[in-house]
Regions:
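Phosphate-coordinating loops and pocket residues in cytosolic domains that bind phosphorylated ligands
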Residues: 4-7, 19, 53, 62, ...
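Conserved catalytic core of the tyrosine transesterase superfamily
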Residues: 12, 86-97, 123-125
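Short, charged phosphate-coordinating catalytic segments
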Residues: 44-56, 78, 99-132, 237
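Conserved tyrosine-mediated DNA breakage-rejoining catalytic core shared by Y-recombinases
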Residues: 59-62, 71, 75-77, 112-171
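C-terminal catalytic core of tyrosine-transesterase DNA break-rejoin enzymes
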Residues: 48, 94-97, 101-108, 197-209, ...
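N-terminal core-binding DNA-recognition domain of tyrosine site-specific recombinases/integrases
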Residues: 1-51, 67, 88, 193-198, ...
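Active-site/catalytic core of tyrosine-dependent DNA strand-transfer enzymes
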Residues: 131, 156-213
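Long, amphipathic, Lys/Arg-enriched alpha-helical "connector/arm" segment
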Residues: 8, 65-91, 101-104, 158
């Protein structure tokens, strides 16, 4: 039934379309977007006729640059990526680890505070309730998450170990430099909040230096998180809630 169609189902459809080929070549992003436009038009008509209340096609969570394909890394590539970031400096190591372990969006990661984490034995609980993004004419603005709701994600022991190490280093940095410890996770050497683009640009260089596909970007780590959850048998409704997708009701 149309009223049971959710954004995550359409996102999975787009992922499958991008895997298809035409005359030996992958479908162009413009072609994939045309498919989505047709689906959206049908759903808009259904909304006008009060068959559905919302058009899920308009809540699709696309990367920052919609023209780029939503490629998904293999498990081997993900393992290689984790090995690579294990050797880079913070705050980048912790930022990218959180991206792949939690599936958070860039703006959500940039807005994280230490108070958003709760230690639960060797593991942890993370609450995502805000986001930081660039607004033309206003600069970086902090607001609610994309769907306007908070969500909770359980974090593995591996992720918590990375976070503990980062927290210790930040405390040492604050003590040695005479700076007050920031409420926010991701600050530079002057304890200023870092610009979201800084993480995107650094990751692009990291991808290029290590031979990852050109179509990979920061949002690719989020796609890997979602696809891994689905592959491990987590139901789509739960995955949608963990990813903070738009209409999950």
């Amino acid at each position: 039934k149309l009223n049971r169609l959710r954004p995550i189902a359409l996102e999975n459809l787009l992922v499958e379309l991008r895997k298809r080929t035409f005359r030996g070549k992958p479908l162009q992003e413009a072609t994939v977007q045309k498919y989505l436009s047709v689906v959206s038009a049908v759903l808009s008509d259904a909304k006008r006729n009060e068959i559905i209340q919302k058009n899920p096609a308009r809540m699709i969570d696309l990367p920052d640059t919609a023209q780029k394909a939503q490629a998904i890394p293999t498990d081997k590539e993900a393992e290689e990526f984790l090995n690579i970031i294990a050797d880079i400096d913070d705050p980048y190591k912790t930022f990218y680890a959180l991206a792949i372990y939690t599936g958070c969006r860039r703006g959500e990661l940039c807005a994280l505070k230490w108070s958003d984490f709760i230690v639960d034995g060797y593991e942890g609980i993370l609450t995502i309730s805000r986001s930081r993004s660039m607004v033309p004419g206003k600069g970086i603005v902090e607001g609610s998450t994309k769907n306007g709701r908070s969500r909770t994600i359980y974090m593995s022991e591996d992720m918590m170990n990375i976070l503990r190490s980062y927290c210790y280093d930040k405390w040492q940095e604050a003590l040695n430099g005479g700076f007050p410890f920031s409420d926010y996770l991701f600050t530079n050497e002057r304890w200023e909040l870092m610009h979201p683009d800084t993480f995107t640009k650094y990751l692009r260089r990291l991808y290029d230096e290590n031979g990852f596909p050109k179509e990979y970007h920061l949002h690719t780590l989020r796609h890997y998180f979602v696809s891994t959850m689905l592959h491990n048998g987590v139901d789509k409704q739960t995955v949608a809630e963990l990813a903070g997708h738009g209409d999950t009701g």
